[in-house]
From Swiss-Prot:
Matching Pfam families: K_trans (PF02705), K_trans_C (PF22776)
GO molecular function: potassium ion transmembrane transporter activity; symporter activity
UniProt function note: Transport of potassium into the cell. Likely operates as a K(+):H(+) symporter.
Name the record gives this protein: Probable potassium transport system protein Kup
GO cellular component, one term: plasma membrane
Lineage per the UniProt record: Bacteria, Bacillati, Bacillota, Bacilli, Lactobacillales
Catalytic activity: K(+)(in) + H(+)(in) = K(+)(out) + H(+)(out)
Length: 667
């Protein structure tokens, strides 16, 4: 990576500052919508709130944002960039060679982050729409929760429906809208805080620690389940590192943090002033003058949509990275914009919409959603902490120091996990079940890949290239294709899967001028596109190692065109002049791509567990994208050949021949 590119990544600009506000902080920036309301509701309402409770709650929020978001994520995790990309899978690619078991926290963290993404749009949009209850002109309509639900579902349907068109145009508005949002949070919070300056005492961590053991706190340590809502967007902050650059996050986070803290302080000041009034409104909206509430609801709805959009886009990126790391099934990906980073996965989009809509219908109110929210993300944060410990050791930090530092954060996050665990019985099981389902799919997919690698045998192309040459020149066989391209997941030097040679020589001899063997390797760098070629001293066998970054589309035909051109220009591959063509001077013949698909038959060598894994993976494949689409072959001539996983394993069933009786035997 060039120094100029590295400097740009660490540099802050005015435009980058605005863009960061729109992309990075949607989740954490909308937390003030529901965090204080959750604290008050779980305490038993305004009448049960005391000054010590409010001071302690705000202090807990301030120090959670400081320790988890600022120190762990902004100051430490942002340093762990994989060629300027962030997120749990990027972090995993940096440390995966240090220990094989690290794939476990990567899978758990990715699954819980993805399941959390299904709940975030539901809780943020519902909280914003419920703000209409505080608008006198509309309160009569929206006191009926059914109207809140219908409005929320309509917004979500439009939001998910627009994903296929990309966010290139509307995305430019995200930054300015969020700038206005954070400014309003800060200004309104400051104005309310000036009415009760004693709220500023919450900066002292004493009030946070005191509240945890105070009898005025009715929930004890479980209050942290509500406090954690204030920092749920910290993981998304790290995941979006590649979109905006480290410098812009460093520059924008202080502004965002101050505005968020002022908002919490302002809501707390309003609560102190009205704790005996019996008002049953969300402190976020109630702390603003009645005449301005409708505008705040509109702004809050826009902010909630932006936060939801960030989570949806983040889910697409997360799934695409998992697919390229071969720990998730392949699904169709499209790129609605000119930017490779702007992608769309239809199956994931509509699955998220279904889960989000069901969440709204099942929980009905934001209060019930908040009771279930946050449990999954505590697990994600714990998994990130484990991977960060290995990263620090890899970067030269003494193992003891790295372990102690990460143990400190792990302890805090584990306490949050325990405090949030009570949410399991209040709806948290929905997210947990969803996360476990995703983990199950990941484990099956990865284990299936390991099993195939264990049993599939390889043969040397050098041992068979003479046979291939004889086949190429054997005119008794019709020309199958000028170029036959075999896509393989496993190729090392001249070693390829036996099933490929079986397809060429045994199944039905395939005569061609050139035999291509292409292996796509996913690199740790996100945007790599390089290749290596070994022709084994021939002009009719081409072994291609195609190195693509984990964020690059694996459209093989597009890359192969360039490789063919390079080989012909360098004289390593004979030109294939075409006598009949509509393209004058065409020197490249036709291509046929062949994909070998291993299937489990009655494989006696497989254990019961291995057979279950392979059969389950085969079942999952029925609802995933075909290799044709994944490798961009839908517009090319391509064939999928099915072969048994173990070619030599032929199940012999007992059977006896019935011999015809002779005349003597009949007599």
């Amino acid at each position: 990576m060039s120094n100029a590119h590295h400097d740009a990544f660490d540099k802050a600009t005015k435009a980058g500052f605005i863009i960061a506000l729109g992309i990075v902080y949607g989740d954490i920036g909308t937390s003030p919508l529901y965090t204080m309301q959750s604290l008050v509701d779980n305490q038993g309402g305004l009448s049960q709130v005391s000054e010590a409770f409010i001071l302690g709650s705000v202090s807990l929020i301030i120090w959670t944002l400081t320790l988890i978001t600022t120190i762990k994520y902004v100051l430490i995790a942002l340093k762990a960039d994989n060629h300027h990309e962030g997120g749990i899978f990027s972090l995993f690619t940096l440390v995966r060679r240090m220990s094989r078991w690290l794939i476990i926290p990567a899978m758990l963290g990715g699954a819980t982050l993805l399941s959390d993404g299904a709940l975030t749009p539901a809780v943020t949009v519902t909280s914003a729409i419920e703000g209409l209850k505080a608008v006198p002109e509309l309160s009569s309509i929206y006191q009926n929760q059914t109207n809140v639900i219908l409005t929320t579902l309509l917004i979500l349907m439009v939001l998910f429906g627009l994903q296929r068109f990309g966010t290139g145009v509307i995305g430019k508005l995200f930054g300015p809208v969020m700038l206005v949002w954070f400014s309003v949070l800060g200004i309104s919070g400051l104005l309310n805080s000036l009415q009760h300056l004693e709220i500023l005492k919450a900066i002292n961590p004493y009030y946070a620690l005191h509240l945890l053991v105070s009898p005025e706190n009715h929930r004890g340590i479980f209050i942290l389940g509500s406090i954690f809502l204030a920092t749920t967007g910290a993981e998304a902050l790290y995941s979006d590192l590649g979109h905006v650059g480290r410098g812009n996050i460093y520059a924008s986070w202080p502004f965002v943090k101050v505005c968020i803290i002022l908002s919490y302080c302002g809501q707390a000041a309003w609560i102190l002033a009205h704790k005996d009034s019996g008002i049953a409104l969300n402190p976020f909206f109630a702390s603003v003058p009645e005449g301005l509430r409708v505008y705040l609801v509109i702004l809050a709805t826009l902010a909630a949509i932006i936060a939801s959009q960030a989570l949806i886009s983040g889910s697409f990126t997360l799934v695409s990275e998992a697919m390229r790391l071969k720990i998730f099934p392949l699904f169709k990906i499209t790129y609605p914009g000119a930017n490779l980073g702007q992608l769309y996965i239809p199956v994931i989009n509509w699955s998220l919409f279904a889960v989000t809509s069901c969440t709204v219908l099942y929980f009905r109110t934001s209060a019930h959603m908040e009771a279930a929210y946050g449990l999954a993300i505590t697990i994600t944060m714990l998994m990130t902490t484990i991977l960060l410990a290995y990263y620090l050791i890899k970067e030269g930090v003494k193992p003891l120091l790295a372990s102690l530092l990460m143990a400190f954060f792990a302890f805090i996050e584990f306490i949050f996990f325990l405090a949030s665990a009570v949410k399991f019985m209040h709806g948290g099981y929905v997210v947990v079940v969803l996360a476990l389902a995703i983990v199950f799919v990941m484990v099956i997919w990865h284990a299936g890949t390991v099993i195939v690698a264990k049993y599939v045998k390889s043969l040397s192309l050098n041992d068979y290239k003479h046979q291939i040459k004889l086949l190429r020149d054997d005119l008794r066989f019709d020309l199958y294709q000028t170029n036959v391209v075999y896509l393989t997941n496993r190729m090392k030097k001249d070693l390829i899967d036996r099933s490929i040679l079986y397809s060429i020589l045994d199944k039905r001899p395939k005569r061609a001028q050139v035999y291509w063997f292409v292996n796509v390797r996913v690199t740790d760098e996100p945007y790599t596109a390089t290749y290596k070629v070994d022709m084994l001293g021939t002009d009719y066998i081409v072994c291609v190692e195609l190195y693509l970054g984990f964020r690059m589309p694996q459209t093989v035909p597009r890359y192969l065109r360039t490789i063919v051109q390079d080989l012909m220009e360098s004289g390593r591959l004979p030109k294939q002049v075409q006598d009949y063509t509509i393209t004058p001077g065409r020197e490249v013949g036709d291509f046929r791509f062949v994909i070998i698909e291993e299937r489990v038959s009655h494989a006696r060598q497989l254990s019961t567990l291995e057979r279950f894994v392979m059969q389950t993976k085969a079942s999952i494949k029925h609802v995933t994208a075909s290799p044709m689409r994944w490798f961009g072959l839908q517009y090319s001539e391509a064939t999928v050949e099915v072969v048994p996983l173990l070619l030599s394993d032929v199940l012999k069933l007992p059977i006896k021949e019935i011999k015809a009786c002779t005349k003597d035997e009949k007599a």
